[in-house]
Amino acid sequence: MRVVFHVPGRPVPKARPRVTKKGYAYTPRKTMAFEQSVVLAYRKSKAAGEPFPEGVPLMMELTFTFEPPKSWSKTRREEVIRRGMCPTCRPDLDNLMKGVADALNGVAYKDDGQIAGAVIRKQYGRKDNTRVIIETMDQKEG
């Protein structure tokens, strides 16, 4: 089984929970909005609507595309896209993946602990977006 979908807009890393003066923890709005857009994109792309079976190891491939900074010249912006250069600044890859994996908990799979392998990359592109591929891993008997 394999699912491929795109999430439009700038990728948002999973932020740490914030705590109010009274001690209540909450997830920041920006993180919640991104997680909701991931779920919406997943539901729009899914053909059968069935989540991956519980206990099945999954492989996740994530490509986070960022527009080059507006402060760069048009020539430089075009060059980094053409040459396939990758951003080396924030946000961190692990937090970007966490945002997508947590958003799909209970939607695409029972728990993100099922993710047994991942390929994650950041790149520059013309539009901000996130490409997600989730598939079952082949089990080889040893």
List each model region and its residues.
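Acidic, proline/glycine-enriched N-terminal capping motif
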Residues: 1-142
